[in-house]
């Protein structure tokens, strides 16, 4: 049977965040765990869910899968048979290693992700971006306990505060004893009789927060900035998560970034190429003069040192590489044609292919 798309398996689309992927896996793995779900195909579905999570939860594997599909994922050992045991889902919930995690122990908050779109020139100069986020913060009414002021959470009388309950099942292999999240306290180890009227027992409320992000000059498409402690609130006094700002840089009409360097095509006239000329070339740092020697051919490259992208680490700028395109004249007068034929007779030179309308792009750029 053909494999299903990993995003489809988890019920997500390709824009899903790491948190979305983790939440979807937890929900589905709990639903189809063979020790809980007795349907005939539960084990196969659990295996499929685990395989999808193994690839999509790894940034490198996910990038390869997004680009090349299953073959790309296989390059990094993913996309094959899921090797996780049936106990793995409980390890995820309770810490693994044969020991359950204390549900009352401090836990770090979730990381958040935010995408910022920049123009190409903004990535050159850097900028300060103000972003508005809706994040979860500790409820001021109950101070994060989830209980009505004047009351407090109580130890769950079903699991005794452990957060798990023991379930016995009759299977073809005999009676099996398994542990699962407590059905009464949902793994927290506590119950709340009178919930906080503000947060309704969650201990957190959503709040809009403005964050200033300093984007350094020279940042590249896909790079991210980490803001420590700006993510989701911690649990039971644990530290807050982090905010990751992912930068997307829009393409430029003329410039193309190659690592820390910039490449561009520069059209020149037939006469400039043949006789040589001093031309004005645009760079991200302003226009500069470039001497084109006589006899320059299409494809000739010139290097402008230090005219590339700044370094985000504060080092030297990259360079700019200029590729010359010799433009074939068109709409010539009779006199021009006559002189060109005379030139051809003298030199035996043949015509060159016409290039596309680069002059229009350059004209537009210089007019800004």
Swiss-Prot record:
GO terms for biological process: chaperone cofactor-dependent protein refolding; DNA replication; protein refolding; response to heat. InterPro entries: DnaJ, DnaJ_C, DnaJ_domain, DnaJ_domain_CS, HSP40/DnaJ_pept-bd, HSP_DnaJ_Cys-rich_dom, HSP_DnaJ_Cys-rich_dom_sf, J_dom_sf. GO terms for molecular function: ATP binding; heat shock protein binding; unfolded protein binding; zinc ion binding. Keywords: Chaperone, Cytoplasm, DNA replication, Metal-binding, Repeat, Stress response, Zinc, Zinc-finger. Binds 2 Zn(2+) ions per monomer. CXXCXGXG motif repeats lie at residues 139-146, 156-163, 182-189, 196-203. Its cofactor is Zn(2+). One of its GO terms (cellular component) is cytoplasm. It is found in: Cytoplasm. The keyword Glycosyltransferase does not apply. It holds the Pfam family DnaJ_CXXCXGXG. CDD domains: DnaJ, DnaJ_C, DnaJ_zf. Zn(2+) 2 binds at residues 156, 159, 182, 185. It comes from the Bacteria. PROSITE patterns: DNAJ_1, DNAJ_2, ZF_CR. The keyword Cytoplasm applies. Zn(2+) 1 binds at residues 139, 142, 196, 199. A zinc finger (CR-type) spans 126-208. Residues 5-69 form the J domain. Belongs to the DnaJ family. PANTHER family: CHAPERONE PROTEIN DNAJ, DNAJ HOMOLOG 1, MITOCHONDRIAL-RELATED. Participates actively in the response to hyperosmotic and heat shock by preventing the aggregation of stress-denatured proteins and by disaggregating proteins, also in an autonomous, DnaK-independent fashion. Unfolded proteins bind initially to DnaJ; upon interaction with the DnaJ-bound protein, DnaK hydrolyzes its bound ATP, resulting in the formation of a stable complex. GrpE releases ADP from DnaK; ATP binding to DnaK triggers the release of the substrate protein, thus completing the reaction cycle. Homodimer. The J domain is necessary and sufficient to stimulate DnaK ATPase activity. Zinc center 1 plays an important role in the autonomous, DnaK-independent chaperone activity of DnaJ. Zinc center 2 is essential for interaction with DnaK and for DnaJ activity. This is Chaperone protein DnaJ. It comes from Exiguobacterium sp. (strain ATCC BAA-1283 / AT1b). The gene is dnaJ.
């Amino acid at each position: 049977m053909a494999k299903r798309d990993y995003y489809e398996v988890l019920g997500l689309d390709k824009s899903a965040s790491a948190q979305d992927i983790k939440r979807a896996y937890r929900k589905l793995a709990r639903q189809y765990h063979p020790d809980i779900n007795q349907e005939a195909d539960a084990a196969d579905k659990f295996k499929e869910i685990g395989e999808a999570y193994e690839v999509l939860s790894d940034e490198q594997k996910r990038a390869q899968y997004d680009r090349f599909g299953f073959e790309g994922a296989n390059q990094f050992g993913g996309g094959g048979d899921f090797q996780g045991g049936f106990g793995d889902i409980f390890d995820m919930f309770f810490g693994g290693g044969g020991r359950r995690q204390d549900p009352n122990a401090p836990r770090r908050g979730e990381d958040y992700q935010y995408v910022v779109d920049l123009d190409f020139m903004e990535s050159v100069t850097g900028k300060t971006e103000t972003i508005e986020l809706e994040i979860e913060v500790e409820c001021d009414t109950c101070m994060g306990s989830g209980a009505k002021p004047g009351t407090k959470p109580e130890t769950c009388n079903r699991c005794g505060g452990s957060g798990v309950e023991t379930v016995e099942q009759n299977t073809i292999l005999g009676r099996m004893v398994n542990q699962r999240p407590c059905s009464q306290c949902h793994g927290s180890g506590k119950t709340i009789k009178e919930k906080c009227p503000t947060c309704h027992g969650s201990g957190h409320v959503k709040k809009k927060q403005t964050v200033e992000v300093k984007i350094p000059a020279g940042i590249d498409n896909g790079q991210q900035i980490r803001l420590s402690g700006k993510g989701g609130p911690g649990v039971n006094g644990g530290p807050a998560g982090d905010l990751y700002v992912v930068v997307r840089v829009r393409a430029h009409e003329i410039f193309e970034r190659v690592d820390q360097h910039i490449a561009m095509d520069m059209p020149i006239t037939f006469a400039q190429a043949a006789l040589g000329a001093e031309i004005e070339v645009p760079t991200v740092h302003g226009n500069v003069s470039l001497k084109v020697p006589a006899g320059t051919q299409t494809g000739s490259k010139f290097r402008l040192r230090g005219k590339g992208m700044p370094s985000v680490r504060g080092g030297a700028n990259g360079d700019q590489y200029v590729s010359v395109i010799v433009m074939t004249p068109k709409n010539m007068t009779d006199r021009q044609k006559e002189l060109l034929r005379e030139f051809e007779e003298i030199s035996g030179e043949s015509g060159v292919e016409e290039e596309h309308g680069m002059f229009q792009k350059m004209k537009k750029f210089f007019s800004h």
